[in-house]
């Protein structure tokens, strides 16, 4: 079978080594004669999986001891509700920075539970889409927290700055599409959450990192399954967790550690992004409309000079083993998602195809 490179934005490509191990263990895991999908989440075998996954995740991100790590249901959208329901406390407003589609989605959900103070950080610089630097973000004095999304998968926009708003500002961030792709200073945040289906594992699992002093503030109406304190008190097993997703994510964490950890992923991701953006920037046939300072290294949207060629580009790229390159309906064009599991070889195959396609159709 020819090599396939999956550029899907999520559910995304998983490391080949992880899929191979999961395949080998699928019907007989740990010598039990059953699949990991069939064992009790409260049995000692799966408890070991859960504990190792949390330890490895903490190691990868250097999570401080005063932070809890929760393995949850509900995806990023579930956390759009969980964040205000858990950390508003007795306040009624929170700061929300709007830099793209997912930030706006979080704002829409938050309006059910509080009055968001929305700061529109989107700007245009020399005709390109960009984001105002953090020093220009206008935060309110009475907000319970400030929320933003460091990487917008649809817009292809990234905010790589580290928050520095003072110790009294609780920062909540949606890291779904950039978690584990670069080092982050967890201590600068109150809450970090990430859906698993991009850089962690398969869909169905969400990881939350929450500073322990923020526990115990949940609104009385907060569903128990979203209550950080209840999840923490029950070892993320208040109800049956998505065990297979948890197991596979644990394998991904071990793969990351065996391949140099987050620091090495950071280097490789930079190489991949530079290669792809380099082809786009050195061409009149392709374009990307995001300012260089805010370009995402995870999600690279691009357009062809002649949109009439879009269909042919997608057909020929798919035939060449380059899958899931169609852009989101909101933006159009193409989008290459190049998360940790995408090897440099895959991006090289894409750029070679792009150069050849331009030669034939430019």
Curated annotation (Swiss-Prot):
Homodimer. Keywords: Amino-acid biosynthesis, Aminotransferase, Cytoplasm, Pyridoxal phosphate, Pyridoxine biosynthesis, Serine biosynthesis, Transferase. NCBIfam families: PRK05355.1, serC_1. Pyridoxal 5'-phosphate binds at residues 76-77, 102, 153, 174, 197, 239-240. L-glutamate binds at residues 9, 42. It comes from the Bacteria. GO terms for biological process: L-serine biosynthetic process; pyridoxine biosynthetic process. Catalyzes the reversible conversion of 3-phosphohydroxypyruvate to phosphoserine and of 3-hydroxy-2-oxo-4-phosphonooxybutanoate to phosphohydroxythreonine. It comes from Shigella dysenteriae serotype 1 (strain Sd197). Its main location: cytoplasm. This is Phosphoserine aminotransferase. Its cofactor is pyridoxal 5'-phosphate. The gene is serC. It is found in: Cytoplasm. Its EC number is 2.6.1.52. One of its GO terms (molecular function) is pyridoxal phosphate binding. The keyword Cytoplasm applies.
């Amino acid at each position: 079978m020819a090599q396939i490179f999956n550029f899907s934005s999520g559910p995304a490509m998983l490391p080949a080594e992880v899929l191979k191990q999961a395949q080998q263990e699928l019907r007989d895991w740990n010598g039990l004669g059953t699949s990991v999908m069939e064992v009790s989440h409260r049995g000692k075998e799966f408890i070991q999986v859960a504990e190792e996954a949390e330890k490895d995740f903490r190691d990868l991100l250097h999570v401080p001891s005063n932070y809890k790590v929760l393995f949850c249901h509900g995806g990023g959208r579930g956390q759009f509700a969980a964040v205000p329901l858990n950390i508003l406390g007795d306040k009624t407003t929170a700061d929300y920075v709007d830099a793209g589609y997912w930030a706006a989605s979080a704002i829409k959900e938050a309006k059910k539970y509080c009055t968001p103070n929305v700061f529109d950080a989107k700007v245009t610089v020399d005709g390109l889409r960009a984001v105002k630097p953090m020093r220009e973000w206008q935060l309110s004095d009475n907000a319970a927290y400030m929320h933003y999304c460091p990487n917008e998968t649809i817009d292809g926009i990234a905010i790589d700055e580290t928050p520095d708003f003072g110790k009294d500002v609780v920062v909540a961030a949606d890291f779904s599409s950039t978690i584990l792709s670069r080092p982050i200073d967890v201590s600068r945040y109150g809450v970090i959450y990430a859906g698993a289906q991009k850089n962690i594992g398969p869909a169905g699992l969400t990881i939350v990192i929450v500073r322990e002093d923020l526990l115990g503030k949940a609104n009385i109406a907060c569903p128990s399954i979203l209550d950080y304190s209840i999840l923490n008190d029950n070892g993320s097993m208040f109800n049956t967790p998505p065990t297979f997703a948890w197991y596979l994510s644990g394998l991904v964490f071990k793969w990351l550690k065996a391949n140099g950890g987050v620091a090495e992923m950071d280097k490789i991701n930079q190489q991949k992004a530079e290669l792809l953006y380099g082809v786009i920037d050195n061409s009149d046939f392709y374009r990307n409309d995001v300012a260089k300072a805010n370009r995402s290294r995870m999600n690279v949207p691009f357009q062809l000079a002649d949109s009439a060629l879009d269909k042919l580009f997608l057909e020929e790229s798919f035939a060449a083993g380059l899958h899931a390159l169609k852009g989101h309906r909101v933006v159009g064009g193409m989008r290459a998602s190049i998360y940790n599991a995408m090897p440099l070889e895959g991006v090289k195959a894409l750029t070679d195809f792009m150069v050849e396609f331009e030669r034939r159709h430019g």
